[in-house]
C-alpha cells in the first residue's frame, strides 16, 4: 500500500488546518520544480503528491470522506478513470462516484437508489370512547362513527381510471428524486414531474383524483373486552385511513374512558362503596343486602360492635380482569347513621340504656383516655 495523504504531508490524522497548511507550504517549497536540486527526477512527482494530498485534506468534507473510505478508494478510482480525465477531477473520475455511499448516508440515499414505490401507508386514527362501569365489567360491543380516507371503490386504490396502468417516471427513472450538481456534492431533489412518487398516472381516476382513496363517513362495530380499565387503548389493525395508491391501511386506536359511578369508586380491580347502617346493627351486628356490580344484591355480615369508618370486604366481588377469571374485591366503608327523629318508644329504650350506662364508673379515666388517643 502506498503512502496515504497524512504520511505524504508528514502530519498526524488529528492535525488541524493550521498544521496542514504549515506542512504543505514547507514541503511545496522544498519540492517545487524551480527549487528542487538539480537532477532530482522525483521532485515533480513528489510535488504533485503534496498538492493532491493538501487538496483533499484542507477541505473538511473531502477529508471526512477520505478518512472513512481510505486511500485505496482514491487509487482504485484513479486507475479506472485514467489520470487527468473525467473533466479535470484530480482523481481521474467524478469524486461523487467514489463516495456514492457516503452521500447516501448523509443525503438520505442519494447514491445508487432503487426505484421507489408510489404506495404510501395510511395514517393511524384515534377514537375516544366513553363507557359506563357495568359495560367495563361485562364487556360490550359498541357501534362508532367517524370520518376517514377509504379505499376508492372505482379504481380499487390504483389511482388510475379503469383499465389504465401507471408508467415509470422518465425524469427520475422511478426513483422519485433527481440529482443536481452543486460544487463538490450531488444534491437530491424531489422529482418535479412525479412529485416523488416515481410513477406517472396518465389518466387519473375521476372519483379519487388519482390518490386511490377518498373521504367518507364510516360506521364500525368495536368489541370492548370485559375488565378494561380507564385509559385502556385497543388497537384495531387496518381500520385506520386507507393508503395512497394501494398502500396499506393505517390502524385505529380506541381509547377507553369510564364514566364515574354513582355507587362505586374504582381502585384497580377493587371497588369501594359507602355502606350506611343503623347504630343498632352497628352495636348488635346483623346482615344487610348490598348491590354488586354484576347486578343483584348479596348479604353482607355486620359484626357486633362495628364502628363508623370500619371497612368490610366482599372477596371476589370487584371488577373483572382482562384475560383472567380472577376478580378484585369490593370494600364497603361503614357509615353509622344516628336517627334524628325518635319515636316515643325509641326514646324510652334509649333512656333506659343511658340509665344503665350511668351506673358504670365515670371516673375511671376511660373517657379521657379515649379522647387523648384521638388527638395523639
Swiss-Prot record:
Q: Which CDD domains match?
A: DnaJ, DnaJ_C
Give the UniProt subcellular location, in the record's own words. Cytoplasm
A GO MF label = zinc ion binding
- Cellular-component GO terms for this entry: cytoplasm
Q: Which terms under GO biological process does the entry name?
A: chaperone cofactor-dependent protein refolding; DNA replication; protein refolding; response to heat
Which InterPro entries does this entry report, sorted A to Z? DnaJ, DnaJ_C, DnaJ_domain, DnaJ_domain_CS, HSP40/DnaJ_pept-bd, HSP_DnaJ_Cys-rich_dom, HSP_DnaJ_Cys-rich_dom_sf, J_dom_sf
Required cofactors, per record?
A: Zn(2+)
Keyword presence, Electron transport: no
Where, by residue number, does Zn(2+) 2 bind? Answer: 169, 172, 191, 194
Q: Which UniProt keywords apply?
A: Chaperone, Cytoplasm, DNA replication, Metal-binding, Repeat, Stress response, Zinc, Zinc-finger
Sequence ranges assigned to domain J in this UniProt record: 4-70
CXXCXGXG motif repeat residue numbers: 152-159, 169-176, 191-198, 205-212
Give the residues the record marks as binding Zn(2+) 1: 152, 155, 205, 208
Q: Which PROSITE patterns match?
A: DNAJ_1 (PS00636), DNAJ_2 (PS50076), ZF_CR (PS51188)
Task: Please share the entry's free-text remark on the cofactor.
Answer: Binds 2 Zn(2+) ions per monomer.
Give the protein's biological function. Participates actively in the response to hyperosmotic and heat shock by preventing the aggregation of stress-denatured proteins and by disaggregating proteins, also in an autonomous, DnaK-independent fashion. Unfolded proteins bind initially to DnaJ; upon interaction with the DnaJ-bound protein, DnaK hydrolyzes its bound ATP, resulting in the formation of a stable complex. GrpE releases ADP from DnaK; ATP binding to DnaK triggers the release of the substrate protein, thus completing the reaction cycle.
Family according to the record: Belongs to the DnaJ family.
What's the entry's take on its domains?
A: The J domain is necessary and sufficient to stimulate DnaK ATPase activity. Zinc center 1 plays an important role in the autonomous, DnaK-independent chaperone activity of DnaJ. Zinc center 2 is essential for interaction with DnaK and for DnaJ activity.
What name has this protein been given in UniProt? Chaperone protein DnaJ
Organism of this sequence: Rickettsia bellii (strain RML369-C)
Lineage of the organism: Bacteria, Pseudomonadati, Pseudomonadota, Alphaproteobacteria, Rickettsiales
Amino acid at each position: 500500500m502506498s503512502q496515504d495523504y497524512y504520511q505524504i504531508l508528514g502530519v498526524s490524522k488529528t492535525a488541524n488546518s493550521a498544521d496542514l497548511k504549515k506542512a504543505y507550504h514547507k514541503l511545496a517549497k522544498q519540492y517545487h520544480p524551480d527549487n528542487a536540486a538539480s537532477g532530482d527526477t522525483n521532485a515533480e512527482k513528489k510535488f504533485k503528491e503534496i498538492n493532491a494530498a493538501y487538496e483533499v485534506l484542507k477541505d473538511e468534507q473531502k477529508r471526512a470522506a477520505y478518512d472513512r473510505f481510505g486511500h485505496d478508494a482514491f487509487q482504485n478510482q484513479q486507475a479506472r478513470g485514467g489520470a487527468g480525465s473525467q473533466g479535470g477531477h484530480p482523481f481521474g473520475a467524478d469524486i461523487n462516484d467514489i463516495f456514492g455511499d457516503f452521500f447516501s448516508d448523509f443525503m438520505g440515499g442519494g447514491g445508487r437508489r432503487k426505484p421507489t414505490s408510489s404506495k404510501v401507508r395510511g395514517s393511524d386514527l384515534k377514537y375516544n370512547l366513553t363507557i359506563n362501569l357495568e359495560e367495563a365489567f361485562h364487556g360490550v360491543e359498541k357501534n362508532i362513527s367517524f370520518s376517514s380516507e377509504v379505499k376508492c371503490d372505482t379504481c380499487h386504490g390504483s389511482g388510475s381510471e379503469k383499465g389504465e396502468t401507471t408508467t415509470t417516471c422518465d425524469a427520475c427513472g422511478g426513483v422519485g428524486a433527481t440529482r443536481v450538481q452543486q460544487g463538490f456534492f450531488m444534491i437530491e431533489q424531489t422529482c418535479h414531474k412525479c412529485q416523488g412518487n416515481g410513477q406517472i398516472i396518465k389518466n387519473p381516476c375521476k372519483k379519487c383524483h388519482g390518490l386511490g382513496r377518498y373521504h367518507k363517513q364510516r360506521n364500525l362495530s368495536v368489541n370492548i373486552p370485559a375488565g378494561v380499565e380507564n385509559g385502556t387503548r385497543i388497537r384495531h389493525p387496518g381500520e385506520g385511513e386507507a393508503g395512497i395508491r394501494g398502500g396499506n391501511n393505517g390502524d385505529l386506536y380506541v381509547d377507553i374512558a369510564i364514566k364515574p359511578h354513582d355507587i362505586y369508586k374504582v381502585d384497580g380491580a377493587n371497588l369501594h362503596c359507602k355502606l350506611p347502617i343503623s347504630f343498632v346493627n352497628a352495636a348488635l351486628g346483623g346482615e344487610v343486602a348490598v348491590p354488586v356490580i354484576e347486578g343483584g344484591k348479596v348479604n353482607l355480615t355486620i359484626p357486633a360492635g362495628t364502628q363508623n369508618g370500619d371497612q368490610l370486604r366482599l372477596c371476589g366481588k370487584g371488577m373483572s380482569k382482562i384475560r383472567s377469571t380472577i376478580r378484585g374485591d369490593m370494600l364497603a366503608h361503614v357509615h353509622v347513621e344516628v336517627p334524628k327523629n325518635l319515636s316515643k318508644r325509641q326514646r324510652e329504650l334509649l333512656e333506659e340504656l343511658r340509665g344503665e350506662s350511668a351506673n358504670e364508673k365515670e371516673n375511671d379515666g376511660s373517657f379521657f383516655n379515649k379522647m387523648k388517643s384521638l388527638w395523639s
